[in-house]
Amino acid sequence: MTVTFDPQSGHEQKGRRPALVISNDQFNQRTGLAIVCPITNTKRNVPFHVALPPESTVTGFVMVEQVKAIDFRARQARFIEKAPEAVLNEALSLLDACIY
């Protein structure tokens, strides 16, 4: 999806950019929120970034360390494409490593 991350603070990503939704549909529908990780095109060799595959419409790297809950309606989120399951699983695994 693309989403507007403004307002932001400090090192948080800002502006309108693609993001990977890591929350499930049930959570999204019941809360009106989505848990997302922004995507950047800047390669930083950060261990918490997941590269998107070349065949993906969206290019870049999922920034797992920038996980955020957003009101997807208020932030005017728009669907782009479904992420490959391998990308989602790697992002969830890295998030788990960050939290536990």
Map each language-model feature to its residues:
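Conserved functional hotspots at enzyme active or ligand-binding sites that engage polyanionic ligands
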Residues: 1-100
